[in-house]
């Protein structure tokens, strides 16, 4: 599938440039687009393909009412899928012209994508090749520091995507906020039932599999979400005290649907950039899901005008870390609608 996207040019038919990718190419693109990370791997998106454009919609049935009551995580997840789609199109030879929130009467219609022929450069190809390699790695990382040049490269990507990126210096304050969010969730029965339904899974096409969930470590510098049914061992010889990951916070000037969609796109761009550089990464959303702790992140960690939209943990995986398996995805027929002729 990756070779189809990045190594061949299917823009021509009978010697002439085609105005729109054919069905095989669209399936290849959307296969990569649906590899985007999403809240609890719910994959809360729907795609509609017509004769001249692609359309991204939310899938309200995949919203988590207890984890994500205001739908922030849903929009961020769809934004990541949108960016994955744009990257895959570019690598295949199509420039995407994205119209965000194109229908005021339908807030679930997040994007309309028109395309034109395009000659991909090596950077676009490399980014697309990172899509199937990217993993959400919740394990302990190594003591190797993330270099200033690597942080600068990620900051430049964030700026290109229209968001602000900051490295979290107030780690102790963030640690306390994360613990407060976890405590609030631990006393929310509906949340716990929902989390148990979507994590620790075996043989499902959605949700977080047990094989991708490490044992929770409350001594971690920034503790992760307490998923159900962990089945992943920590890398041998690692300890939270030696974990030298950085925490990045992405922020925007506004706090609305468009800002959240853009932040999701930027999240995708940063995660793929980290993958290209060989870095491990993991989004952190729990402290931003509760209004009180989200305000605390804004006041005590972000410390600037605007709104924090996403936290990312980035670092070097331990040399002893086993390769992570990919998380499952719903079949394309479950998330893609093909318009009639």
Predicted feature locations:
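Acidic, surface-exposed loops and disordered segments
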Residues: 1-341
């Amino acid at each position: 599938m990756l070779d189809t996207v990045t190594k061949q040019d299917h823009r021509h038919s009978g010697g002439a440039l085609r105005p729109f990718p054919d069905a095989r190419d669209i399936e290849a693109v959307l296969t990569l687009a649906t590899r985007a990370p999403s809240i609890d791997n719910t994959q809360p998106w729907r795609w509609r393909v017509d004769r001249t454009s692609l359309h991204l919609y939310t899938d309200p049935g995949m919203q988590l009412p207890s984890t994500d009551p205001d739908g922030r995580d849903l929009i961020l997840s769809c934004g990541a899928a949108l960016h994955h789609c744009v990257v895959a199109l570019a690598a295949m030879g199509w420039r995407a012209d994205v119209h965000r929130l194109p229908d005021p009467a339908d807030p679930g219609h997040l994007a309309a994508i028109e395309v034109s022929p395009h000659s991909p450069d090596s950077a676009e190809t490399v980014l697309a090749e990172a899509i199937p390699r990217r993993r959400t790695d919740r394990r302990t990382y190594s003591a190797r520091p993330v270099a200033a040049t690597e942080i600068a490269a990620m900051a430049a990507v964030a700026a290109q995507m229209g968001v602000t990126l900051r490295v979290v210096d107030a780690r102790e304050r963030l640690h306390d906020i994360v613990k407060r969010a976890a405590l609030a969730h631990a006393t929310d029965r509906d949340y716990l039932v929902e989390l148990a339904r979507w994590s620790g899974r075996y043989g499902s096409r959605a949700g977080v599999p047990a094989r991708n969930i490490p044992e929770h470590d409350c001594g971690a510098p920034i503790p992760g979400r307490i998923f159900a049914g962990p089945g992943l061992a920590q890398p041998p010889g690692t300890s939270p005290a030696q974990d030298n990951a950085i925490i990045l916070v992405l922020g925007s000037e506004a706090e609305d649907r468009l800002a959240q969609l853009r932040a999701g796109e930027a999240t995708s761009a940063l995660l793929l950039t980290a993958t290209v550089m060989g870095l491990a990464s993991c989004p952190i959303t729990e402290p931003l899901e509760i209004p009180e702790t989200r305000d605390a992140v804004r006041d005590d960690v972000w410390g600037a005008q605007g709104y924090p939209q996403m936290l990312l943990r980035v670092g070097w995986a331990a040399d002893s870390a086993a390769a992570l398996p990919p998380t499952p995805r719903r079949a394309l027929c479950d998330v893609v609608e093909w318009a009639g002729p």
